[in-house]
């Protein structure tokens, strides 16, 4: 049956070759069978600018380019790769999506988000997010030498890890009130997002109507994909390959 695939939170980096191998397997064996592929943020562990053309980044860009030649491929930036820009889109052939975006998925309106904006109890991250999403801040960051951007990215990742270790389970997750607010505002019955690394299908009720929130999984020890079929059925699928 015709279907569309959704992935997020691969956190690709040169230091995790097993995850890269799983992504390349996904491109070869799963993506070609889909109508379209949506990547909902944190595709990279860190992205410091489209001008950072390392051999590893070129490899990933070329793999996306091959995919996008034959399949519509959509890319939403996350909090780890928010500096991805139009040059990356031109090099890969992906279409950039704003966060949030409502798409028509087999004639059904579906809200797509990375998901970090839903974690409103994490006040420190929300303050950080408000800063980094300002166009002038991004322009300033991209004006810095690559060597300095690498150092800053490393520093930010270390700070993020320390911060996450201090948070309780609930603070790291989305808040139901924000989920309800956003879904009401966008007038949708289905929300798909990543970020929290807690793959699940949540049944909700909004304005007396049954709704769903699907959370994509992170690629820690293997692949994680949402397969959404034309008939409205869907499944979160995990896979692992022998390396």
From Swiss-Prot:
Mn(2+) 1 binds at residues 9, 11, 42, 197. It comes from the Bacteria. It is found in: Cell inner membrane. One of its GO terms (biological process) is lipid A biosynthetic process. The keyword Zinc does not apply. It catalyses: UDP-2-N,3-O-bis[(3R)-3-hydroxytetradecanoyl]-alpha-D-glucosamine + H2O = 2-N,3-O-bis[(3R)-3-hydroxytetradecanoyl]-alpha-D-glucosaminyl 1-phosphate + UMP + 2 H(+). Mn(2+) 2 binds at residues 42, 79, 114, 195. Coiled coil: none annotated. One of its GO terms (molecular function) is UDP-2,3-diacylglucosamine hydrolase activity. Substrate binds at residues 79-80, 122, 160, 164, 195. It is a peripheral membrane protein. Hydrolyzes the pyrophosphate bond of UDP-2,3-diacylglucosamine to yield 2,3-diacylglucosamine 1-phosphate (lipid X) and UMP by catalyzing the attack of water at the alpha-P atom. Involved in the biosynthesis of lipid A, a phosphorylated glycolipid that anchors the lipopolysaccharide to the outer membrane of the cell. This is UDP-2,3-diacylglucosamine hydrolase. The lineage of its organism: Bacteria, Pseudomonadati, Pseudomonadota, Gammaproteobacteria, Legionellales. The gene is lpxH.
